[in-house]
Amino acid sequence: MKKILIIGLGLIGSSIALGIKRAHPDFEILGSDRENIQEIAQKRGIIDSKVSLVEGAQKADIIILAVPIITTLELLKKLATLNLKKGLLITDTGSTKSEIVELANQLFDEDKVRFIGGHPMAGSHKSGVMAADINLFENAYYVLTQENQELRDLLKGLHAKFIILDAKEHDRVTGQVSHFPHILASALVWQSDDFSKEHPLVKHLAAGGFRDLTRIAEADSLMWTSVLLSNPEITIDRIENFKKQLDEIALKIANKDSAAIEHFFEQGKKIRQAMEIHKGALPNFYDLFISVPDEKGVVLKVLGLLEDFSITNVKINEENREDIHGQLQISFKRAEDLKEAREIIEKATDFTVV
């Protein structure tokens, strides 16, 4: 019986365990974490056995490190001192890859212990073992730093989309589309809070657009500190690049160059619409925005048209916003469902669908 050790039984580690169990019910899942977390995981059928780090590592055929980056680095050093099975496969789930992969390559002889960096690009506003979700990674990208069929097979029950990406390129790409936006979100919150000291209405008028832009500012501060410090060069490069872009648009505004300003927004709109937005580090789905009249029963009418679809979330935006796409927001897990739902609503109603 193949033994899989998962170190870290939070949302990611526990959800991976459930996915492995779905595809490989004959595998034994060992779990290492704090005693109370292990107890919960075992009672909920997420793991089969509770083990200490040393005991589990020496028994395991595959080890998954589902812990923060700084802890992953410490654990790799600890594992390198243990008597591990020859041919052991180790992988991680960290949001950056270069520092982790470089350390693993220094510590382990590939003929004895193999290391494949991993990054499941999905998450939730919930956390901890109680939030474990067998479908968390469905249709989400799962990055591997090199091809490995054994790991693909192990994780096939996650129903994720595996892509192979060099560690350095992974950090460049995620630095732009994941790490840097978290800096922007928190910076905008800081700026607005400072501005509100002289203009207190800021906090009352900050509605839809501000809320959407700054949602990720509520992410785990310790985790994101660890992420940024693990990817400093790319992060600083993206900050400097953004400063230049802000300076350029500021100059256009100062020069009252309306054509250039309009082009700035129009081009941004086109680029955004052309992007295929998938699940990222936090929940992100395929969203349909519908402008509906403020009438009784209209939401039920729309949902009735979509009764055969798997809908992830329905949100009614109550405030009137000058920048909103539609008062009703419906989220799907699959792009195909969004496309079909759009066609159904457009045929059955005169509502504007975006």
From Swiss-Prot:
GO terms for molecular function: NAD+ binding; prephenate dehydrogenase (NAD+) activity; prephenate dehydrogenase (NADP+) activity. The keyword NAD applies. InterPro entries: 6-PGluconate_DH-like_C_sf, ACT_dom, NAD(P)-bd_dom_sf, PDH_C, PDH_N, Preph/Arog_dehydrog, Prephen_DH. Coiled coil: none annotated. It catalyses: prephenate + NAD(+) = 3-(4-hydroxyphenyl)pyruvate + CO2 + NADH. Residues 287-354 form the ACT domain. Its EC number is 1.3.1.12. Keywords: Amino-acid biosynthesis, Aromatic amino acid biosynthesis, NAD, Oxidoreductase, Tyrosine biosynthesis. Residues 2-283 form the Prephenate/arogenate dehydrogenase domain. It is an enzyme of class 1 (oxidoreductase). It comes from the Bacteria. Pathway: Amino-acid biosynthesis; L-tyrosine biosynthesis; (4-hydroxyphenyl)pyruvate from prephenate (NAD(+) route): step 1/1. One of its GO terms (biological process) is tyrosine biosynthetic process. Belongs to the prephenate/arogenate dehydrogenase family. This is Prephenate dehydrogenase. It comes from Lactococcus lactis subsp. lactis (strain IL1403).
